[in-house]
Amino acid sequence: MCIRDRNTYALEGSIFIAGAGVQWLRDKIKLINNAYETEIIAKSTKTNNGVYVVPAFSGIGAPYWRSDARGLITGLTRDSDWKTLVRATVESVAYQSYDLFRSMSKDGLKPKIIKIDGGMVANNWFSQFLSDIIDLQVIRPKILETTALGVAVFAGYKSGVFKSLKEITSLWKKDRDFKPKISKANRNNLIKGWNLAIKRTLV
């Protein structure tokens, strides 16, 4: 992207299934009636009980890039129930984000905070879990649909509605921030389980 006649670069990583995983829970296997229920359900469970969902419904994106990968549910026992499956599906987005940041760190990216957006981050439980897994402060904006906002403001910038990038920047307002709360040992254990699930998916 060119801003003020200067090329500006960014690292990008694709997660193929994020909010679409929640749609799958709602539309295909009928475990929920709407996306908002996932927060209540996740809060009602103490742990994932070792259950992981790898939502590779159309392959898996960065950093694995395997179009032949398919979805997997692992760790099921007789104690597993539908609530565990809902929680594990929501958790999967945080784990996939962790994989992206781990990959980006190898290219020298070491962020101190993360700004999130999109409909899924309205879920307070998920936003906190994301912070716990990536071990960084996560900041949520008041306007969740940042992509749509970005299109609008850049159109406004080009047409002269906004006079400067500083003016555009001032439109972004913080709603809430989330800071890591879980122990290092707990985080490592959760990630270890995810890594095993990924390994099984990629066999």
Name each model-derived stretch.
Residues 4-203:
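Active-site core segments that coordinate phosphate-bearing ligands/cofactors
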